[in-house]
Amino acid sequence: MKTPLFLLLVVLASLLGLALSQDRNDTEWIQSQKDREKWCRLNLGPYLGGRCRK
């Protein structure tokens, strides 16, 4: 029982590390954020009252 829980914790910790290590000044990351917001406004905006960001 301890082994699956330990593996889950290791996986979650590694994913958190990847999320925190993202370079948010990278031009590719900035462009992907702009593309995501544009997609959100076009597809989800009317359903969320025009809001797409958290």
UniProtKB/Swiss-Prot annotation:
GO terms for biological process: egg-laying behavior; G protein-coupled receptor signaling pathway; negative regulation of female receptivity; negative regulation of female receptivity, post-mating; regulation of egg-laying behavior; sexual reproduction. It is found in: Secreted. GO terms for molecular function: G protein-coupled receptor binding; hormone activity. Residues 53-54 form a propeptide. One of its GO terms (cellular component) is extracellular space. Its main location: secreted. Glycans are attached at N25. Ductus ejaculatorius. Disulfide bonds join C40-C52. Keywords: Behavior, Disulfide bond, Glycoprotein, Pyrrolidone carboxylic acid, Secreted, Signal. Residues 1-21 form the signal peptide. The modification Pyrrolidone carboxylic acid is found at Q22. Induces post-mating responses; increased oviposition and reduced receptivity. To paragonial peptide B. This is Ductus ejaculatorius peptide 99B. It comes from Drosophila melanogaster.
